[in-house]
């Protein structure tokens, strides 16, 4: 997968897979062993599919188009549910996201009469990568729905403001 000017390789951690496969045949266990690595950081790569065959279902799951379905960026966050998200992009930013969509599911659903904004829906897991992308657009894009994501963005922006005012770290990580 190509993301932010870097190629990534999707694979399975074999040594752990051998141990888990002996103890359990559940494909969900194997899914937890999937690793995504930046290609430019790999110093040695060995194809071992012949020694450690995966099921046809698992091979299909690991293709980039299936593995990254409904995902933004390189992380597939199983614990983050797929959501239908509605955003509003203001002029001239909407020209940019129409030329380079935020996600392949992006669809324009409304345009203001005065041409000042357009609204879009996306079906995606709202991962950290996705939130960072929305924040990168600053005040030019806002989340309308779901309300939980809108409130999360408001919380992030409030924490950012307070961090700038106080010089303290308020990222929620200890």
Task: Name what the model sees in each region.
Residues 1-2, 110, 135:
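Well-ordered beta-strand positions
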Residues 2-8:
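Coil-to-beta-strand transition motifs
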Residues 5, 106-107, 132, 151:
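Residue-identity detector for glutamine
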Residues 6, 41-43, 140:
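Structural motif
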Residues 10-129:
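Surface-exposed, charged, gly/pro-rich loop-and-adjacent secondary-structure segments at domain edges
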Residues 122-174:
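Generic C-terminus detector
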